[in-house]
Amino acid sequence: MTQETKNSILIIGGGLVGLSIAYEFSRNNFKVLVLSKNRNESAGFVAAGMLATHAEGLENELLKFGQASQNLIPKWIKSIEQDSNIKCGLKKCGIVVPFKNKEDLEEFPTYKYEDI
């Protein structure tokens, strides 16, 4: 195997996940090729800007993992902005989850995880 193929990566799909993977490999000196059928078919055109693991119905360890991952995003976005000289537009603005009554609130999966 030649040096060129040893450090080459092919990624199928140019959505948010595919491009994120490509970015990380590229930062680590891999030659990256992304193949994408149609860019506007990716999930990024639907909800890529929504970072709300606490509103996804996750519980216990999966919720904690999601929250920890979400907390890494600002630093990651900053590295993308520095590498590209393009602002990504990340804004922390919260989320509103309305409830009809206190019982519904208490049944919400993240209600009992106030320390997260």
List each language-model region with its residue ranges:
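Beta1/beta-strand and adjacent pyrophosphate-binding region of the FAD-binding site
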Residues: 2-17, 33
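Flexible, glycine-rich phosphate/dinucleotide-binding loops
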Residues: 18, 41, 60
